[in-house]
């Protein structure tokens, strides 16, 4: 459910790799919230990272498309959302695109070497 240590690039400031329990909890909440028609409904993903702080953002990697990542803003309702636009998709694309989106949105510069 979480990314393996060998496949872990540097993350932007404020993002962290989850421990196994956190990865499992984030993935389980995502699965509870996903309604039919959502971008991730039926898509195999693994918890890749999460943003620390007041946000409920988690970065999921598509297991069948290793360079596709989706940032989801979880609602933590503990049940299926009724609107297919929720939980909210904040980003969907490559890891490089994720880094660029973080920089654009929050002024967070990509880590060195990326």
Which sequence ranges carry the predicted segments?
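Glutamate identity and glutamate-enriched acidic tracts
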Residues: 13, 29, 33, 52, ...
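Negatively charged, low-complexity tracts enriched in Asp/Glu with abundant Ser/Thr
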Residues: 2-44
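Helix-rich interaction surfaces within compact, conserved domain-sized segments
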Residues: 68-113
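Intrinsic disorder and flexible coil segments
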Residues: 2, 33-38, 51-55, 92-95
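Classical N-terminal secretory signal peptides
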Residues: 1-2, 114
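Amphipathic protein-protein interaction modules
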Residues: 39-87
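Charged/polar, solvent-exposed surface patches and flexible loops
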Residues: 25-32, 47, 93, 97-104
């Amino acid at each position: 459910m979480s990314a393996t240590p060998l496949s872990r690039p540097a993350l932007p400031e404020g993002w962290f790799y989850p421990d196994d329990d956190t990865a499992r909890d984030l993935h389980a909440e995502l699965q509870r919230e996903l309604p039919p028609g959502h971008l991730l409904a039926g898509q195999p993903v693994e918890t890749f990272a999460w943003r620390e702080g007041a946000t409920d953002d988690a970065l999921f990697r598509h297991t069948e498309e290793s360079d596709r990542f989706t940032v989801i803003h979880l609602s933590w309702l503990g049940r299926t959302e009724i609107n297919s636009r929720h939980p909210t998709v904040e980003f969907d694309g490559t890891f490089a695109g994720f880094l660029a989106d973080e920089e654009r949105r929050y002024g967070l510069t990509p880590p060195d070497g990326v």
